[in-house]
């Protein structure tokens, strides 16, 4: 059975439910305006462990979604519904892959067909043009397209946005989109940042070029989420376990944003961050923030319940090039967590 036919039926079902809820008060049908986007790379046991999960683990993720009443839709449909101000179904998910590895076609695709789940693949076109070992071919990508899979832009040569000028990045993105269009026909303007790295200037470039941007920082997506850097939960390597994946797939979008500093780029190993937390079905007194799993100090401007802004601080530690601060709060009435993460990038460190 083709992915596109099932996806269309899910889409029609969602629109029908939205209509019914417009006529009735569907308080329980929609809990929060929220969707979780996951990102995978390899589905294999013979590829780098940090970006891989086994076929058995991937099947377990899909079975969890199927058996626990999740709705899986294409990212384009979710973004469109958010931008229209429409209602989103409870427990909504989009599945994505980065890079265009061969195991996506040979292993992940049949499993996703089995469950009838739509998905998106972000490809770097250079390795595919060179027929580089381990990557899909254009012929395989055409078969995915024919099954309703969305093919997104991951640049031409998978270069970090922090390692090239804006003119170079613009040319790289446009070239990749041209190759995708030439081989597969028009595709939505979706761009996943290589390595998940971006600057304020590169986010502005993505908006200028008319793309929706996808990051690799954890968290769910809601109406106020920055669409030049939508969060995605990486679910591979040490994060491939079903217990952790189940928790993350169940999270809710936190209406939160970093107010200071103004950029995620830093040369500090322990930058402080001032975060604005919007209203939601949670107690601000129960917000907890973490740095690599360690609790952070939270200093509210006033009392927690009387303020919407807090500064979070951490201790000095050795860092790599990328890390995240994570803030969560339990939902008042559901066994789910609001989840926000703030990524940091130190481009002086090696990739």
Label each PLM-derived region with a short phrase.
Residues 2-91, 110-119, 125-136, 235-351:
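Terminal accessory/targeting
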Residues 76, 216-217:
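Beta->alpha turn/N-cap motifs
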